[in-house]
Each structure stands twice: as structure tokens, then as C-alpha cells.
């Protein structure tokens, strides 16, 4: 088994030649493009996908390899997941050659081999550079081709930085150097994810407003912080993909996701000092300005401002860059129960909302939209330990007030303000349960 650690970027077609020229200056070992043919397999009931597993056969110059990728972690475009590779003499699956640890119950399901069938394919040329960064070995792969499922297809034009040996920080360091040039967009959608989508008939991707965050029952505050930022980054990347594919309404959700990053930093600000995220927040400001301007989606998402901000957030998360800024007291707090933290801060944010909206504000409602947005975001991040139906019903009145203010509906404003202020809390006031 190998632990695959790689960072993926989508490359703007117009930037390919400039990118190739830059990669040739890095002083690494260059490999000419080779054609890679891949067939991905699945069962009719999506058993593999349901277990977060991906199965493929890759062909290269008459050689074949079967690969099984299993559940891992994706932070931004940084993929960290185990993979199992088996050499084959011909392009035919042989699941019995995979180790038993691959399978959920420690053994190959009896009927799986007879149920898997080709689902989609990728056909692309891979050009590689092997470079050394601070003693770590990194493979840079430029892939160009297409992914295809039945009558549907879409182009592949992406860059992958894979850590062959050494430290993940070296991958991030190299990535920072590369994104200083325009044309790269950190992407979380793998070739396989795009293939699965095409195989489903290429349905339109829908806008997904942020929902309540759920974390493990025994999570500590640091795990809550990580989960909140990962949610914000996932929302950012998902809606950026929609925006660049032509859904103009997704732009608002991209900006909302960046705001969620800021609101997360504020929520945990009593533990993580502002100086820990100064550089990150500066890059977010530059990114927001670029996105909010009148430039096209393509220009905005492939800009250096967006690429650097998203990469900085990924690096901040992966390296836990807040830790060097924590004193002994903060170290104790961040190791405490996230459930207790959530109860305390739910009460604080609810009290703030009531203090602001306890009385009609006349023409001053719009002035309070930023505060209302921040409080709603914070409650979305904190409410996951409670009945989701009850918590969402509580939130909907405040979300309704937000929408009414944003759209100038005076009657609706007062309706939702009264409803929101008169509802009972769904959490424990004491912070204990």
C-alpha cells in the first residue's frame, strides 16, 4: 500500500505553454508525454462509490496496472488517500490479487467480481518533471486529454504535484511558487469524480447553501476548527466550479464561502489570536476584491489572487499554522470539548441577535446584515450536536429575516424578527450535557 499525497490544479488551456516553459526552468528530470488509458469500474448499485473506493485499470505502452483507492482526506485540492497497485499481464480485473485489508470486512465480497463493469474512461497524455524541493522528491504531472462516459465527455487539463518522498510542506512550497503565475485553479474534483458525474448523465450541478456542520461526538475544539474551515473551503471550491462552468448565481456563494472562512476565524478568535492568520486574511481580502469586481468568472478563478488565497487556506489547515501562536492557556482551551465550546457560543450568538433585533430598526436593518450573516454562519458551525430538524427550524427564522432585509420586504422583516425572537433555544445554556 502507498499513501498518495498530491495537490491538484485545473489549468486554463491558454496558460499551458507558459506553464510548461516555467516547469522547464525548475531544473528537474523531464519525461516526454506518454498516453495513459484508464478504465474505471463500478457495480450497478455503486457499491464501490458507497464505500469511498475507486477501482481502475491503467494501460501505458502495453503495460497494465490495477489500482484501488480507498477512503482518505481531501483538503482543498490536497488529496491524501491510500492506494493499492497490482501489475497485470492483460487489461482484465483480478480482484483476488488485492490485499484483504482493502475490503470493508477484511475479505473480498463473493459476488463483487461478477458485478463490476466499466463505467467511464479517461484518455490523456501525461508529461512529467521530477524535482527536488528541500530534500523531498516531487513528481509534477501535466495531463491533457478527456474523460468520457457514454455520450458525455469533458476535457482534462490539469497539473498534479505528487509527493514521492519527504515532507508535505515541500509540495505546498512548490505550489506557492507555481501559483504566482496566472492560469492555475486549485481543484478538488478528481478525474474519477468527473467521470462518475458524466456516467450519471451529466446532470446540472445545483447551488448548495451551507448546511449545519456535524463533527464527531468526542471532537475537541481544534477538530471543530478544522472541520469548519474544511466546510468553508469545500463550499468555496464547489461553487467556484459552478461559476466557471457558467452558473453566474454561484458567484454569491463563492463570496459567502470566503466570508465563512472569516467568520470561522472570528468564532475561534478567543483561542487563536488574529496574528496567526494575518497573512491569510490579507490574501482573502485581495481575492474577494478580484471576485467582486466586474471581471469574468474565468479571469477571477484563474487569477493569482484567488489561487494564492485558496492555497494559503489549504496550507494553514494542513500545517495547523495556528499552533505556534498558542500559549499554554490557549493550548488547554483548544484541547477541550467542542460540544462545550458550541453550547457556550450558541448562547452568546443568540444573545447578540436578540440584543440587536429586539426592537424594530426602521431604516437601519441593512446596516446589521453583516452581523446577522456572521451570527447565522457561526450557529451553522455550532449546532451539529442537536436534532437537525429542530436546529434548522430555529435557524430558518433568522435566515428568513436575513433574506427579507436583503430584498427590502418590510412586512416580512417584522414577521421573521418577531418569530425569531420568540423561539426557544435548542441547546443547553450551561454548556454541559
UniProtKB/Swiss-Prot annotation:
Its EC number is 3.6.1.25. The keyword Hydrolase applies. This is Inorganic triphosphatase. Residues 2-202 form the CYTH domain. PROSITE patterns: CHAD (PS51708), CYTH (PS51707). It comes from Escherichia coli (strain K12). GO terms for molecular function: inorganic triphosphate phosphatase activity; metal ion binding. Residues 218-433 form the CHAD domain. Optimum pH is 8.5. Keywords: Hydrolase. Disruption phenotype: Cells lacking this gene do not show decrease of specific PPPase activity. Involved in the hydrolysis of the beta-gamma-phosphoanhydride linkage of triphosphate-containing substrates (inorganic or nucleoside-linked). Catalyzes the hydrolysis of inorganic triphosphate (PPPi), which could be cytotoxic because of its high affinity for calcium ion, thereby interfering with calcium signaling. It also hydrolyzes slowly thiamine triphosphate (ThTP). YgiF is a specific PPPase, but it contributes only marginally to the total PPPase activity in E.coli, where the main enzyme responsible for hydrolysis of PPPi is inorganic pyrophosphatase (PPase). InterPro entries: CHAD_dom (IPR007899), CYTH-like_dom_sf (IPR033469), CYTH_domain (IPR023577), YgiF (IPR039013). Inhibited by calcium ion and activated by magnesium ion. It catalyses: triphosphate + H2O = phosphate + diphosphate. The lineage of its organism: Bacteria, Pseudomonadati, Pseudomonadota, Gammaproteobacteria, Enterobacterales. It holds the Pfam family CHAD.
Amino acid at each position: 500500500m502507498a499513501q498518495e499525497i498530491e495537490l491538484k490544479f485545473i489549468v486554463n488551456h491558454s496558460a499551458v505553454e507558459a506553464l510548461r516553459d516555467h516547469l522547464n526552468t525548475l531544473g528537474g528530470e523531464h519525461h516526454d508525454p506518454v498516453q495513459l488509458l484508464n478504465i474505471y469500474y463500478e457495480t450497478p448499485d455503486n457499491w464501490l462509490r458507497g464505500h469511498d473506493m475507486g477501482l481502475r485499470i491503467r494501460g501505458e505502452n502495453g503495460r497494465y496496472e490495477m489500482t484501488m483507492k480507498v477512503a482518505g482526506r481531501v483538503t482543498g485540492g490536497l488529496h491524501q488517500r491510500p492506494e493499492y497497485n497490482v501489475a497485470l499481464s492483460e487489461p482484465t480485473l483480478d480482484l483476488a490479487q488485492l490485499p484483504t485489508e482493502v475490503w470493508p470486512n477484511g475479505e473480498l465480497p463473493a459476488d463483487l467480481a461478477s458485478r463490476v463493469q466499466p463505467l467511464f474512461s479517461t484518455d490523456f497524455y501525461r508529461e512529467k518533471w521530477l524535482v527536488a524541493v528541500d530534500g523531498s522528491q516531487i513528481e509534477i504531472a501535466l495531463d491533457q486529454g478527456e474523460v468520457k462516459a457514454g455520450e458525455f465527455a469533458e476535457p482534462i487539463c490539469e497539473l498534479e504535484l505528487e509527493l514521492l518522498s519527504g515532507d508535505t510542506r515541500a509540495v505546498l512550497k512548490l505550489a506557492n511558487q507555481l501559483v504566482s503565475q496566472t492560469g492555475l485553479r486549485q481543484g478538488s474534483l478528481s478525474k474519477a469524480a468527473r467521470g462518475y458525474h458524466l456516467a450519471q448523465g451529466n446532470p446540472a450541478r445545483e447551488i448548495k447553501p451551507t448546511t449545519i456542520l456535524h463533527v464527531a461526538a468526542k471532537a475537541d475544539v481544534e477538530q471543530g476548527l478544522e472541520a469548519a474551515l474544511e466546510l468553508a473551503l469545500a463550499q468555496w471550491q464547489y461553487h467556484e466550479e459552478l461559476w466557471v462552468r457558467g452558473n453566474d448565481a454561484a458567484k454569491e456563494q463563492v463570496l459567502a464561502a470566503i466570508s465563512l472562512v472569516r467568520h470561522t476565524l472570528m468564532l475561534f478568535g478567543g483561542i487563536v489570536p488574529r496574528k496567526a492568520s494575518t497573512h491569510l486574511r490579507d490574501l482573502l481580502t485581495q481575492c474577494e476584491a478580484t471576485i467582486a469586481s466586474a471581471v469574468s468568472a474565468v479571469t477571477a478563478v484563474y487569477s493569482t489572487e484567488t489561487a494564492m488565497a485558496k492555497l494559503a487556506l489549504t496550507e494553514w489547515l494542513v500545517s495547523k499554522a495556528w499552533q505556534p501562536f498558542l500559549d499554554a492557556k490557549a493550548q488547554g482551551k483548544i484541547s477541550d470539548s467542542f460540544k462545550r465550546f458550541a453550547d457556550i457560543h450558541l448562547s452568546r450568538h443568540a444573545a447578540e441577535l436578540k440584543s440587536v433585533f429586539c426592537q424594530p430598526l426602521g431604516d437601519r436593518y441593512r446596516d446589521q446584515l453583516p452581523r446577522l450573516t456572521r451570527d447565522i454562519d457561526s450557529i451553522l458551525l455550532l449546532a451539529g450536536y442537536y436534532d437537525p430538524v429542530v436546529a434548522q427550524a430555529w435557524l430558518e427564522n433568522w435566515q428568513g429575516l436575513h433574506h427579507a432585509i436583503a430584498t427590502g420586504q418590510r412586512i416580512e422583516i417584522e414577521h421573521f424578527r418577531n418569530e425569531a425572537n420568540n423561539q426557544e433555544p435548542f441547546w443547553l445554556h450551561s454548556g454541559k450535557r
